[in-house]
Amino acid sequence: MTLPDFHDESVLREHIATTMAFYDPRSLDPSGGFYHYYKDDGTVYDRSHRHLVSSTRFVFNNAMAAIEFDDPQYIEAARHGLAYLRDVHRNPQTGGYAWTLRDGKPEDTTNHCYGEAFVLLAYSTAVKAGVLEALPWMDETWELLEKHFFEAGPGLYRDEADASWNFSSYRGQNANMHMCEAMLAAYEASQDRRYLDRALLLADNMTRRQAAKAQGLVWEHYDVHWNVDWDYNKDNPKHLFRPWGFQPGHQTEWAKLLMILDRFLGGEGKAPAWLLPTARHLFDEALKHAWDHEFGGIAYGFAPDGSVCDDDKYFWVQAESLAAAALLSERSGDPSYSTWYDKIWAYSWEHLVDHKYGAWFRILTRDNRKYDDEKSPAGKTDYHTMGAAYEVIAAMRRGWK
């Protein structure tokens, strides 16, 4: 296979356009929101089920496309998605958002911090795209998070509550990582310092304090006191949002976020010295343990002893890792990260990108075979793949090549 030049901005821009074309215009449900389930060829295979993670990520996708391509159809699609979040997912009595819906009615009313992070990301990205009516919704979401989810003691967010705001004892890194991402987007949209300060607090507490309890890496699962729970989901290691084992993709995703923090704070001359070495450590360890030297690509998970415990190849792991490699290359100047960027893109282009219909396949076996023809079930939306491309394009426009 002939590979394009992944250091050419136009290549990434075209890749975003073809990925958006997989979803548009078929993703738009005229009766409200977006369809969430797609076969490889784009056929919608469940028209009535909705998931908060997809509902929010489709807003992100369309708002980002509106910024990049200056096309009013994307702004209208983003507004269409925001209306569904406000009118259908959101419970005006509690302020919470339904996790899943069936036929426009709440199915699972659990309040997940992970979902709230994407609500804030959706509102923030919409504001960046010029949808200024979403600005007060950012404030509303901050207040909801402060009231119910944030724990000042550990300086992290609680994970999940029922519809009446009774919280479980589970604590997790995944929600806090995506909350850090959302806070960075909120800061970009508003220039309100509280968002940047909170993003730094979350990053510090997860990648330094909590990582110090888990071999210097970010473990996924904790008890109510933020002690490491080494056994959570050990019997269900492929759980969609709470898998067992160290997640290489989350180490590299944190590395990406640390580099964004470094750039924002560095512009003020206030970037903590630990950001770059911590990001490098997380990325380097992830690739050391999880890169598949035989079949290529980054494995999904590795155990505390360093052995691979889940050798599947997930789309988002590769996407987040190539974005992290680009930002590490930009910040450090170390040529090894540019090499990783090229290597991960080459693998992804050959095996995960669907050059016939567009977008990325979701998951492959270790030897790069598909499991099924469900390219994009609820939660995917190719937010990770396009988000990574946007991040790299931004680095290129700052001068990275």
Residue ranges, per PLM feature:
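Glycan-recognition and catalytic cores of secretory/periplasmic carbohydrate-active enzymes
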Residues: 1-401
